């Protein structure tokens, strides 16, 4: 498909055009004994800009709306503050390099590379980074040296008959523990639901995740657009027992919002399935 596009005349470009994306943020955790749940809801607007080919800039701030947990959730603070470069090495290889302020109060450098089979069903991916802590609560911005090294290797397979993706990964988390994780994700059109399980340093964890499409995908390309993200994604961690949380096991970070990752799900069998479904619905009208 990429070869067929070579030499095609460019109709428009996203260079220099700005998106103001208003991400909803939800926190729901039950790893404390003094209340049933820690919960928070906030808006996380981000200024996003496409630079040169494969490069993007994201500047995000987190605005608290309501919560039942004092501390960071009461403060206006930085979200993602990143410069990201994506690249394609060959038809089957792609990767990224990014630096800046990530999720989970981390900042540093991270990189990843992945191999994708010809039919897109098999994937082998590796990623890692070196980070330090980054806390900006009110007027106090605390940072530490970049000394925490993490990395993981994952293998995934997409089962087209049931539109399900299986992924198994293993590696080193932020605070030095090693573990493995298995994820099962089922796709229903643009909706995704899934389960995961993790084992690290003698402790277990599990949970579920889902992703739902948000309205407003049909947009005109103006110099500045204000919009919602394409998807709202959420993951709930069970964290069995207090030991998992006390020892900060299985802690990782994201270099971009989860909904941004969902927007790039390009598995060929799944795209074909969605196109066939769309065509069938059109014929019935």
Q: How would you label these PLM feature ranges?
A:
Residues 10-19, 52-58, 88-94, 118-124, ...:
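Short loop/turn motifs that connect adjacent beta-strands in outer-membrane beta-barrel proteins
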Residues 31-40, 51-53, 65-78, 99-109, ...:
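Solvent-exposed loop/turn segments connecting transmembrane beta-strands
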Residues 1-83, 144, 277-285:
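Outer-membrane beta-barrel initiation region
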Residues 20-33, 57-67, 83-85, 90-102, ...:
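Transmembrane beta-strand segments that form the barrel wall of outer-membrane beta-barrel proteins
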Residues 41-52, 75-89, 109-128, 149-159, ...:
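Feature captures outer-membrane beta-barrel proteins of Gram-negative bacteria and organelles
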Residues 1-9, 123, 143-144, 150, ...:
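Flexible, glycine-rich linker and terminal segments associated
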């Amino acid at each position: 498909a990429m070869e067929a596009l070579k030499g095609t005349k460019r109709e428009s470009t996203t260079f220099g055009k700005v998106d103001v994306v208003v991400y909803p943020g939800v926190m729901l955790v039950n790893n404390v004994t003094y209340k049933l749940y820690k919960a928070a809801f906030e808006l996380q607007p981000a200024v996003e800009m496409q630079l040169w080919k494969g490069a993007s800039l994201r500047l995000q701030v987190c605005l608290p709306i309501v919560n039942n947990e004092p501390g960071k959730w009461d403060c206006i603070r930085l979200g993602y503050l990143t410069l990201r470069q994506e690249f394609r090495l060959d038809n089957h290889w792609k990767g990224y390099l990014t630096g800046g302020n990530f999720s989970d109060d981390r900042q540093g450098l991270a990189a990843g590379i992945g191999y994708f089979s010809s039919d897109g069903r098999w994937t082998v991916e590796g990623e890692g980074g070196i980070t330090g802590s980054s806390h900006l609560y009110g007027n106090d911005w605390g940072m530490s040296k970049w000394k925490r090294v993490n990395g993981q290797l994952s293998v995934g397979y997409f089962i087209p008959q049931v539109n399900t993706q299986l992924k198994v990964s293993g590696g080193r988390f932020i605070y030095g523990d090693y573990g493995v994780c298995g994820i099962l994700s089922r796709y229903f059109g643009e909706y995704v639901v899934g389960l995961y399980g993790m084992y690290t340093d003698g402790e277990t964890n599990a949970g579920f995740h889902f992703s739902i499409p948000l309205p407003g995908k049909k947009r005109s390309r103006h110099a500045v657009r204000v919009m919602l993200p394409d998807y709202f994604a959420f993951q709930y961690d069970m964290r069995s027992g207090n030991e998992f949380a006390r020892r900060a096991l299985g802690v990782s970070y994201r270099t971009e919002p989860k909904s941004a990752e969902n927007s790039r799900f390009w598995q060929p069998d799944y795209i074909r399935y969605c196109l066939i479904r769309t065509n069938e619905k059109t014929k019935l009208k």
